[in-house]
Amino acid sequence: MLKKQQRIAAASPKTVLGSPMANADLVADSIKRASGLDVDFIVFPELALAGASLGSLLSHPHMLDLSGRALESICRATENLSITAAVGYPCEINGSVRSAVALINRGSVLATSFSDCAEAPFGFIPSVEYHLSKPRSIFPRNINVVFGNELLSSKLSVPDGNVTLIPSFLNATAHSDRLISEALRRYTAISGFAAAYAAPNSGESSSFFLYDGLCAISAGGEIIAMTEPFSDDPFVYADVNAAWLASAKAVPVMQQPTYYLSQKPERAAHECRRILRLQAEALRRRLEHTGGRGFIIGVSGGLDSALAAIAAVKAADMMGLPRSGVLGVSMPGFGTSIRTRENSRKLCEALGCSFREISIVDACAAHLEAIGHGTDKRDVVYENAQARERTQILLDLANMENLLDVGTGDLSEAALGWTTFGGDHLAQYGVNASLPKTVIRRVVAEAKAEFREAADTLQDILDTPVSPELLPSQAGEIAQKTEELLGSYEMHDFFIYQFVINKEKPSAIVEKAIRELPFDPGEIRRAFDVFIRRFFTQQYKRNCAPESPHILASISPALWRMGSDVLPDGSFREGNAGGTENA
């Protein structure tokens, strides 16, 4: 038990990715800042000296050497300070690169602990049961180090000590704030310890994950200090004493997500707002990295491009850029309806974006004639030529005007392969890629309150049937309705969650869908057969998908690894699938 009051802190100074010496200076400055506040213990994120998102470069001998030198630099800079700091860095042990945490006090490394995680951390995947770390040296009696991924493990035991420092590499998701808060409260309630938690920040790569620099202090089953997500100054401290630790409330139950969004309306609304914030942060980080002057989006008058436009506008606002730096491009083709064409323009005008309309009809007709196809044959070539023409226009304009081409494709489309290879399948960054269509609908609905100037147009977009609009229609109406062709997205998004996240057996997924979804059993079985067939045969598109942030559920090549020539046999569906669909 704690004998006296102690002050503990957590900090996540903005990472300079791949620059250990620069990070060492930032860490040393934070240690000095904490020491000036009479802090006794401070924790920094896992791999803070190199960057948690550095990937394979973490194991490069040069990076390991620089990280070791950076650690020595921190020791020299803090040799006269009594504060104890937990600093994360990559380290080679017996020929294997591991995430290490050094406990530094008065210029010396008191102890080091090593995680059993692979050299390239793979992000926040709550369903994974992590291996626990094995300390390689003895810690002072009153200090304990637990890695962030262990905090979520059901196998985490309570070691000796009364202060737990938790360096983490866990990324930000729609649910991570709640999960980490509940895990900290549970840990401190059970252990009787105080705990300080620090996660990586927005200086990390946004290629596949986002990091919000979450820092928190917990004691007695309560969160007593926590930073705001993506804070400009992720640094917190708090005083804890024996009274705090003795006053633990009832042990909180860790509730893993049971579906994409909470069943509680207030929590679901919070998650929708957080999703949009994460999307905007991802775009901000990517634009800062590329040095572009703004964003370009192909606006179709549909849900996906509406959300991408909103996220881009929010990112521009956060960066202090004019909304005119967001360019929405409408590219009407053979099947574009009057309604979606008008909504594309109205949305951009309401949001204050720049707007441009470029018809692709003549360009596509010329292309089809040039390859000997003609415009009277309404097949897959006819449809895909339009999608590829739009992508070419967007990428060329992005180059010409120094803009970031923001992809609009979503998780549902990626799972079903409902994209054109080399067409809307490509972009410079896919901001919607981890969000299913049904969630996008709810995020857009929630966004109406924030973007009131566009609320009427957003509502009309919400009321518009989902369609690729690639086939001509009569009287300017929508000819193709995706859910009439594939089945309801409510079913397909359910299948994705159960198959990819819960990893349920196909038979169990169908049985669960019949129990829980408002559809005829025969319709559910037909839709599931479509889902499984297309999920397997369309993998080749996902294997070369653009980089995208993992916010809800990802089947990007960084997280879902599967050969494109794997076919669903009797293990996954009745009968054998044959052939591939090279759309």
Tell me what each language-model feature is.
Residues 4-7, 18, 192-193, 205, ...:
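ATP/NTP-dependent adenylation/nucleotidyl-transfer catalytic domains that generate, transfer
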Residues 1-298, 309, 314-325:
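Enzyme catalytic cores with a strong preference for nitrogen-chemistry domains
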